[in-house]
Amino acid sequence: MSQDLIETTATTTKIVEARELGHQIHDSLLEQLKLQQEELLQQQRDLFFQEQQLQLQQQVTQPVSNNGNTWSFTQGLVIGQVSVIFIIIVFVKFFVFADSSSHIPTKPGLDGAIGVIVKRNKNKKHSNGQFANDGENEDDTSLDSNQSKISSILEKTYYDVNNHASESLDWFNVLVAQTISQLRSEALLKDNIYHSLNNFLTNAKLPDFIDTINLTEIDIGDDFPIFSNCRIKYGEDLKRLEAKIDVDLSDTLTLGIATKLLLNQPRPLTAVLPVSLTVSIVRFSGCLTVSLINTKDIDLKNVDKTSNMNGYSKENANGDGASSSNNDEDEDDGGTALMFSFSPDYRLEFIVKSLIGSRAKLQDVPKISSLIENQLRTWFIERCVEPRFQVVRLPSLWPRTKNTREPVTKKTTTTPSTTVNGTSAATITTPGEYVNSNI
């Protein structure tokens, strides 16, 4: 029992000592915390005082620094504005306006196009001295330039003149047929052909032994030419591309006239011989050669210039000479033209009917038929058969306001019928008419 008490007492003593030790440690920790809190508060006070001092210093020095910044900003603004104005003046003077001393007025023409038109053929440049010293080199150069231009066109259009298949031109036949049909309709409705031919025959200067010529029959046909077998070839004679087209027309184009042969010997109107002629073209076929040219590129010799001038003198008497002279001037100026001709192996068939006499009449005299047919063939050969050709100047293709049209819908109206060659026709206005939109 005594040992248990001793152990209990010892244990109690240890517990008490441990509690006291814990209280001491707790107290020491509290004291340390208080000391640390006081140190932190002191540091905060010091920092607060330092911040206040800095703010006071900044408030004292701020007016002086603001004055310096304001002055430097004003200087920069003024200098910047002046520099911008100076740059604008320099740009306007040297880049917008041209130098008046370097501007030399020149005549408008080909020289004005130098430096404006883009020239892509850079390999074909030659000095003026080379062209002036050697004329043959100039011809060779122009020939080479033309050949290279043709080669470039064929290359860029993927056309081989030697192996390319011929074309049918069906679409072109439709367009030509529409045009001819429109011309025939206008001729039937307005009698354009009759009045034109009648005025020509009336105003023509005839020999004394021929009386006035009267029209008896006009037939403008009802069929259309057929163009086919179109192929592009290189013309060796004129050094240009040509379109060769086969043309075939099977139709009846008739012109009938009536006149009188006068016998004025030994006295005027001693005898009168009535003559009636009817000439019909029933068949034409041949190879048409078409090409676009510049009238200044080649030497186009006018085959019948003298006779044309004589013909124009008659027109001058009627008041049309001004237009003819203007046409001559236009031809001298050059420009784009359509050149066409027919091959010598063409086929042209006629039917000539003649009736001579008043009571005892001679019908279809072979000599007269042969004479008229030969004259017509000669007239055609001298104008359209190779090596001669026709040149038709083309109008300008640039869009112009005066050529602008727009469709206008109109009511269908009819006018009193007209009679042409025994056939009555009425004028019909269709809704598809066009008017000038610039009116």
UniProtKB/Swiss-Prot annotation:
Superkingdom of origin: Eukaryota
UniProt xrefs under PROSITE patterns: SMP (PS51847)
Domain SMP-LTD per the UniProt entry, residue ranges: 165-395
Gene Ontology cellular-component annotations: endoplasmic reticulum membrane; ERMES complex
Molecular function GO terms recorded: lipid binding
Record topological domains on the Cytoplasmic side: 98-439
Bilayer topology: Single-pass type I membrane protein
Lumenal side: 1-76
Record bears the keyword Ligase: no
Signal peptide: none
Description of how the protein assembles with itself and partners: Homodimer. Component of the ER-mitochondria encounter structure (ERMES) or MDM complex, composed of MMM1, MDM10, MDM12 and MDM34. A MMM1 homodimer associates with one molecule of MDM12 on each side in a pairwise head-to-tail manner, and the SMP-LTD domains of MMM1 and MDM12 generate a continuous hydrophobic tunnel for phospholipid trafficking.
Family recorded in the similarity comment: Belongs to the MMM1 family.
Record remark on domains: The SMP-LTD domain is a barrel-like domain that can bind various types of glycerophospholipids in its interior and mediate their transfer between two adjacent bilayers.
Protein name: Maintenance of mitochondrial morphology protein 1
Native species: Candida albicans (strain WO-1)
